[in-house]
Amino acid sequence: MSAKIKADEISAIIKERIENFDLSVDVEETGKVISVADGVANVYGLKNIMAGEMVEFEGGEKGMALNLEESSVGIVILGKTSGITEGSSVKRLKKLLRVPVGDALIGRVVNSLGEPIDAKGPIEATETRFVEEKAKGIMARKSVHEPLQTGIKAIDALVPIGRGQRELIIGDRQTGKTTVAIDTIINQKGQDVICIYVAIGQKQSTVAQVVKKLEEYGAMDYTIVVNAGASDTAALQYLAPYAGVTMGEYFRDNSRHALIIYDDLSKHAVAYREMSLILRRPPGREAYPGDVFYLHSRLLERASKLNDALGAGSLTALPIIETQAGDVSAYIPTNVISITDGQIFLESDLFNSGIRPAINVGLSVSRVGGAAQIKATKQVSGNLRLDLAQYRELQAFAQFASDLDESSRKQLERGQKMVEVLKQPPYSPLPVENQVVIIFAGSKGYLDDIAAASVTKFEAELYPYIEAKYPEIFEQIRTKKVLDKEIEELLHKALKDFKATFSVA
């Protein structure tokens, strides 16, 4: 028996086929390279491309559209330029640059695109984020109130940093800027802070040394290193800080705390200037393009302390700027000083005279960190800045006047001892309770009758003595975070007992 063919069934099938017929064609917009030089390709034919959009060249190299002109597009090449020649085809990828984020990156060294460069295998990241993100608004933020201890006495006592702050480290070359940053990373051990170190335009050997130092102190367990070396293209150096801050924002947005160090933003500005001049953008002051302020402001504004509703996470930024012969009034230094919440100024004169870290306490300031400083540190360092300022004034005066009155001489001597107290060898950050004890000893006159040369020995022997005989002092400061009358009395007793046993020899 032959099956009956129903006309309405056939028409229903035909209708369904017509409705489901997909006429869309996957159109790929392609262009041709007109010229290529210095890591920038001029491309003709990509009429609908967006600013910041990713493209792919014939050999698989990626690029990013930065200049949109009437007849051509200026594309910076994110990789090797050797395979790209005049006439090479370029296709739009219709997406913006994203980098991997998350815990999988911790302990790794990556490039500006988040690709591993440490020969430890691929990174199994489950999430990616846009490199360019808008900074959080006012309502999403909370004022800085938790301390971020650097472990450096001069900073934690006089220029305190809070979680979510932007504090600039500024100084000439070879004044210990990177050392301050590495000390801060080492001091975050056990503090549940993820650190991101962004190296921009540095020698590969220097970055390798930093990574080795971090591994030596076990700091790579909670650190990500983003490296765009001196041999990398200007485009990769330009992208490195944005890639780093994107990785840091992931932790901040997940109710965690992160610290990011940009080493350094002077080289970042130079890379951006190089890229802009090749793209034929009009130069301004010091040949930097007009939007160089925006380059750094949009980067540093992404560091913040989030409010409780958003999880109370934080991202603290420590940008580094290199000055020429101590000139802080140059274009880039003044820009970054005005964007940040304070600066730590390192001086080559202090460094050369043996005061290390070479922090100029008079020029260094923290505009918001005071609220984050623990009460015990506030109590002992309240007059320290003023005392040091008076000491410097007296020191300048004493060079010309031989006969000083008794009180001036005492003030000069105590100032000298306090300068010694604030000295610290590199890669040896101090817990906050130890800092409180030694600054207390100096400010209460326990070092007055000890020679300046013996202060370091006094300090080195004091901590183990208190740990052995009066462990409750450290414990109380650590937990209570305040010097009450009881601890003060105990501290006086401990210092008197220690002085009785201390010998200079």
Swiss-Prot record:
Pfam family for this entry, one: ATP-synt_ab_C
The protein's assembly and partners: F-type ATPases have 2 components, CF(1) - the catalytic core - and CF(0) - the membrane proton channel. CF(1) has five subunits: alpha(3), beta(3), gamma(1), delta(1), epsilon(1). CF(0) has three main subunits: a(1), b(2) and c(9-12). The alpha and beta chains form an alternating ring which encloses part of the gamma chain. CF(1) is attached to CF(0) by a central stalk formed by the gamma and epsilon chains, while a peripheral stalk is formed by the delta and b chains.
Mode of membrane association: Peripheral membrane protein
Molecular function as annotated in GO: ADP binding; ATP binding; proton-transporting ATP synthase activity, rotational mechanism
Catalytic activity: ATP + H2O + 4 H(+)(in) = ADP + phosphate + 5 H(+)(out)
Keyword line: ATP synthesis, ATP-binding, Cell inner membrane, Cell membrane, CF(1), Hydrogen ion transport, Ion transport, Membrane, Nucleotide-binding, Translocase, Transport
Role summary: Produces ATP from ADP in the presence of a proton gradient across the membrane. The alpha chain is a regulatory subunit.
CDD domains named among the record's database cross-references: ATP-synt_F1_alpha_C, ATP-synt_F1_alpha_N, F1-ATPase_alpha_CD
InterPro entries, alphabetized: ATP_synth_asu-like_sf, ATP_synth_asu_C, ATP_synth_asu_C_sf, ATP_synth_F1_a_nt-bd_dom, ATP_synth_F1_asu, ATPase_a/bsu_AS, ATPase_F1/V1/A1_a/bsu_N, ATPase_F1/V1/A1_a/bsu_N_sf
Organism (species): Campylobacter curvus (strain 525.92)
Protein name stated in the entry: ATP synthase subunit alpha
SUPFAM superfamilies in the cross-refs: C-terminal domain of alpha and beta subunits of F1 ATP synthase, N-terminal domain of alpha and beta subunits of F1 ATP synthase, P-loop containing nucleoside triphosphate hydrolases
Classification of source organism: Bacteria, Pseudomonadati, Campylobacterota, Epsilonproteobacteria, Campylobacterales
One GO cellular component, as annotated: proton-transporting ATP synthase complex
PROSITE patterns according to UniProt: ATPASE_ALPHA_BETA
Highest taxon of source: Bacteria
Positions with a binding annotation for ATP: 171-178
EC numbers on record: 7.1.2.2
Subcellular location per the Swiss-Prot or TrEMBL entry: Cell inner membrane
HAMAP family noted in UniProt: ATP_synth_alpha_bact
Similarity annotation: Belongs to the ATPase alpha/beta chains family.
PANTHER family, per the entry: ATP SYNTHASE SUBUNIT ALPHA, MITOCHONDRIAL
UniProt-annotated site: Required for activity, residues: 364
